[in-house]
């Protein structure tokens, strides 16, 4: 008997009809003599609605306000967990919903982007022994002050991976509205191919570069704890998805396996005389604000940072306070940027790969603002209006399949 974690995303639970259709998927896994723990997201669109409501009543610029923001946002997953438990009970499957504080899932105090410190599994183990399917509300935790916290966007993926690690599960299955991971976005590249199997590290780079199927925190966790993960379609449950696992690779051959883009970015330009480049960077990274790129433009005068667009409210409040305190002279935001990332082992050491990219972009009059290289990824920072054209041309250049 194996333990399988099943996570269902927002589109999979978007309405009552879809929630009812999840029951046979869970039932089929139990029929294989496996134990199942389910993690759910909020219904599609609900979290965005809750964010809008919070923004209508609050400026969200202090810790107390973000604590209440977390309470509001977490309600979406709570509703889904209870509805799915009811749907399973109607199918004569014993099920019970669980919230983060009941286990508990203990986090730090960073409201809206908390990091998980520990998970107590006693309650989950007890209910599994009673042949009951635990339905966990994803995206949420609780801190040592007994205040509810949230894990940031994509947090339900993270919850599923954390539960898989804590429970030493055999596998973590992510059910979504697509049939797996593709070599490129099928909306841009209609002939993009589904990847049957992908290495943990390649998937991590793909997820962190804008591929929206999985959150990079979840991939990092299953990689760290060596737990296989599958990406499957709720709407075609019998279709083979993508397996994320350890696999052999040849580091010497520079082969592009996939390409992705990310427009969910924000460029911050900061002018400061009193604060150094590293001091400003350190302040930005507080409260788990993530920096993708950073650059000192003028010595001790002007700095540039690329962060997630979702951090805009936090950073607006931080930089406004610094400006009011005269620690910085000015700052500007620019959201009209995008990254294009090409993923594949050995591409950093194969000079021909970067040469081909730069030659093609020069020919196409695409302006590249920054380039970032790792062993398995080349990332280009460009203007967002050039993103789709660049993906299409580079996909065809490298004949990705």
From Swiss-Prot:
It catalyses: L-aspartate + ATP = 4-phospho-L-aspartate + ADP. One of its GO terms (cellular component) is cytosol. It comes from the Bacteria. One of its GO terms (biological process) is homoserine biosynthetic process. InterPro entries: AceGlu_kinase-like_sf, ACT-like_dom_sf, ACT_Aspartokinase, AKii-LysC-BS, Asp/Glu/Uridylate_kinase, Asp_kin_monofn, Asp_kinase, Aspartate_kinase_CS. One of its GO terms (molecular function) is ATP binding. Its EC number is 2.7.2.4. Pathway: Amino-acid biosynthesis; L-lysine biosynthesis via DAP pathway; (S)-tetrahydrodipicolinate from L-aspartate: step 1/4; Amino-acid biosynthesis; L-methionine biosynthesis via de novo pathway; L-homoserine from L-aspartate: step 1/3; Amino-acid biosynthesis; L-threonine biosynthesis; L-threonine from L-aspartate: step 1/5. It is an enzyme of class 2 (transferase). Keywords: Amino-acid biosynthesis, ATP-binding, Diaminopimelate biosynthesis, Kinase, Lysine biosynthesis, Nucleotide-binding, Transferase. NCBIfam families: asp_kinases (TIGR00657), PRK06635.1-2 (NF005154), PRK06635.1-4 (NF005155), PRK06635.2-2 (NF005158). Belongs to the aspartokinase family. This is Aspartokinase. It comes from Rickettsia felis (strain ATCC VR-1525 / URRWXCal2) (Rickettsia azadi).
């Amino acid at each position: 008997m194996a333990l399988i974690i099943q996570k269902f995303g927002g589109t999979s639970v978007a309405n009552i009809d879809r929630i009812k259709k999840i029951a046979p998927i869970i039932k089929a896994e139990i029929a294989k003599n496996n134990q199942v723990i389910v993690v759910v997201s909020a219904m599609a669109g609900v979290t965005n609605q809750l964010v809008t409501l919070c923004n209508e009543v609050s400026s969200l610029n202090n810790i107390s306000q973000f604590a209440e923001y977390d309470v509001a946002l977490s309600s979406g997953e709570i509703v889904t967990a209870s509805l799915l438990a009811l749907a399973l009970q109607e199918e004569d499957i014993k099920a019970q919903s669980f919230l983060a504080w009941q286990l508990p899932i203990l986090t730090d105090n960073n409201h809206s982007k908390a990091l998980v410190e520990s998970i107590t599994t006693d309650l989950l183990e007890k209910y599994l022994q009673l042949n009951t399917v635990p339905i966990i509300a994803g995206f949420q935790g609780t801190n040592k002050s007994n205040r509810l916290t949230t894990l940031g966007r994509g947090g339900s993926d993270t919850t599923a991976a954390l539960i898989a690690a804590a429970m030493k599960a055999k596998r973590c299955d992510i059910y979504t509205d697509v049939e797996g991971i593709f070599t490129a976005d099928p909306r841009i590249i209609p002939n993009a191919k589904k990847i049957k199997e992908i290495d943990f590290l390649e998937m991590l780079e793909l997820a962190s570069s804008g591929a929206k199927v999985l959150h990079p925190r979840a991939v990092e966790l299953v990689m760290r704890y060596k737990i296989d993960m599958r990406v499957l379609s709720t709407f075609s449950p019998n279709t083979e998805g993508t397996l994320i696992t350890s696999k052999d690779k040849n580091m010497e051959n520079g082969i592009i396996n996939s390409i992705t883009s990310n427009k969910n970015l924000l460029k911050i330009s900061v002018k400061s005389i009193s604060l150094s480049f590293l001091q400003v960077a350190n302040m930005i990274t507080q409260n788990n604000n993530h920096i993708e790129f950073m650059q000192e433009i003028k010595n001790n005068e002007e700095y540039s940072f690329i962060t997630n667009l979702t951090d805009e409210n936090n950073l607006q409040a931080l930089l406004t306070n610094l400006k009011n305190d005269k620690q910085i002279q000015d700052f500007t935001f620019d959201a009209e940027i995008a990254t294009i990332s090409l993923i594949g082992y050995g591409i950093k050491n194969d000079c021909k790969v970067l040469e081909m990219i730069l030659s093609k972009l020069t020919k196409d009059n695409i302006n590249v603002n920054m380039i970032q290289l790792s062993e398995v990824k080349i990332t280009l920072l460009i203007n967002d209006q050039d993103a789709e054209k660049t993906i299409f041309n580079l996909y065809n250049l490298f004949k990705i399949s």
